[in-house]
Amino acid sequence: MSQTPDQRILECLENEYPSDLSIEEIAEKTGMHRNTVSKYIWGLEREGKVKISRRVGRAKMYITITE
């Protein structure tokens, strides 16, 4: 069974933890388009599964929220 975009993004961030990633980096690592990553990361942020860890210029860096 294939993973949903949400699952692919979360898995990518979990694999890189404790490092944070930009939308562009997540897109490269998952093979998804950056617009798709942006759409789904926004939803994951609203659900409290990821958060912005810092900003580098205009880019937002994301990290998973561990329990």
Feature-to-residue mapping (PLM):
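Alpha-helical DNA-recognition elements
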Residues: G43, E47
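A short acidic, leucine-rich amphipathic alpha-helix
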Residues: E25-A27
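Short, cationic-aromatic polyanion-contact patches
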Residues: M1-D6, D20-S22, R54-E67
